[in-house]
UniProtKB/Swiss-Prot annotation:
Reactions that this protein is recorded to catalyse: a ubiquinone + NADH + 5 H(+)(in) = a ubiquinol + NAD(+) + 4 H(+)(out)
Signal peptide start-end: none
Cellular localisation: Mitochondrion inner membrane
Name of the protein: NADH-ubiquinone oxidoreductase chain 2
Membrane topology recorded in Swiss-Prot or TrEMBL: Multi-pass membrane protein
Keywords assigned by UniProt, alphabetized: Electron transport, Membrane, Mitochondrion, Mitochondrion inner membrane, NAD, Respiratory chain, Translocase, Transmembrane, Transmembrane helix, Transport, Ubiquinone
GO CC entries: mitochondrial inner membrane
Organism the protein comes from: Rhynchonycteris naso (Brazilian long-nosed bat)
GO MF entries: NADH dehydrogenase (ubiquinone) activity
Function: Core subunit of the mitochondrial membrane respiratory chain NADH dehydrogenase (Complex I) which catalyzes electron transfer from NADH through the respiratory chain, using ubiquinone as an electron acceptor. Essential for the catalytic activity and assembly of complex I.
Keyword Chaperone among UniProt keywords: no
Length: 347
């Protein structure tokens, strides 16, 4: 892609998200979503192929439907309240429709159907943008309207997202699909605590973006898209591969890695709010997500086939293109759990 066009598209994506996050006018928020959607589609088709065309079409149809529902909710709220700005007296019907529209844009279950297919059909860089940056705009709107969201609807979608995110990733061999299902599960964790403690949602989102960005950067460094290809990188780049596996375990929420921190704090907060059954269900379903990451780690590191001795030192002569910020991302993605006591005391 031409660098000038790439810069223009990226700037439009950022601008659309910033408009959504900073506006208090419903029409401006809708326009920001539309700018973001129309700008991301050329990014999805950056590597032209039938799969990328199919992925971009699925993304467009889903986001267009969500935008239509969002506009319907805005109009209903306008008729009820008589104003275009945020109001705490939102019509219950408009609130439900808007929650469904934002869930479709985020990929929450049961509106998750497009996330794995679209992520699988695009490049790693586009997948990184789709699973991180594209979550900011709808989640920011949910954050603002959280006091008036239907609690039962949001918690139902959260539990379904955690369950489907763990269940769907069990039989996957494509790394992009695994990360897509992991994204669905993480969105479920974020929305489950949104009404009770919105600041904890922001903490979870920050750590999720950090870990996902690091994982995608490592995959781009090794040009890896399948579990088989990941296992073959062990002899060539053992340090990069071991770092990838540790960060994926962190994404699964294995203590003492940093991915355990948001799950721990969310379950603690739900318990404080007397949601014992919900916290128990989330803890049990989180094991599904951790299981397929542990299975991937086991298959990659502990089931290596016998190799010749001269292959063991191949990594010493392999000059791979390194990213300067990669070591810092790896450290932040795995070793920030000691911040937990300070966060709990501040909370």
């Amino acid at each position: 892609m031409n660098p000038l066009i790439f810069t223009l598209i990226t700037s439009t994506i950022v601008l659309g998200t910033m408009i959504v996050m900073t506006s208090s006018h419903w029409l401006m928020i809708w326009m920001g979503f539309e700018m973001n959607m129309l700008a991301i589609i050329p990014m999805l088709m950056k590597q032209y192929s039938p799969r990328s065309m199919e992925a971009a079409t699925k993304y467009f149809l889903t986001q267009a439907t969500a935008s239509m529902l969002l506009m319907l909710a805005i109009i209903i709220n306008l008729v009820y309240s008589g104003q275009w700005t945020f109001t705490k007296l939102m019509n219950p019907t408009a609130s439900i429709i808007m929650t469904v529209a934002l869930a479709m844009k985020m990929g929450l279950a049961p509106f998750h159907f497009w996330v794995p297919e679209v992520t699988q059909g695009i490049s790693l860089l586009s997948g990184l943008i789709l699973l991180t940056w594209q979550k900011l705009a709808p989640l920011s709107v949910l954050y603002v309207i959280s006091p008036i969201i239907n609690l039962d609807l949001l918690l139902t979608m959260s539990i379904l997202s955690i369950l489907i995110g763990g269940w769907g990733g069990l039989n996957q061999t494509q790394l992009r699909k695994i990360l897509a299902y992991s994204s669905i599960a993480h969105m479920g964790w974020m929305t489950s605590i949104l009404i009770f403690n919105p600041m904890m949602t922001l903490l979870n989102l920050s750590l999720y973006i950090l870990m996902t960005a690091t994982t995608f950067t490592l995959f781009m460094t090794t040009s890896t898209t399948t579990t088989l290809a990941l296992s073959h990188t062990w002899n060539k780049m053992p340090l990069i591969t071991s770092s990838t596996l540790i960060i994926m375990l962190s994404l699964g929420g294995l203590p003492p890695l940093v991915g355990f921190l948001p799950k721990w704090m969310i379950i603690q907060e739900l318990t404080k709010n007397n949601n014992i059954i919900l916290a128990t269900l989330m803890a049990i379903t989180a094991l599904l997500n951790l299981f397929f990451y542990m299975r991937l780690t086991y298959a990659t590191s502990l089931t290596m086939f016998p190799t010749m001795n001269n292959m063991k030192i191949k990594w010493q002569f392999n000059h791979t293109k390194q990213t300067k910020c990669l070591p810092m991302l790896i450290v932040l993605s795995t070793m920030t759990l000691p911040l937990a006591p300070a966060m709990i005391l501040l909370n």
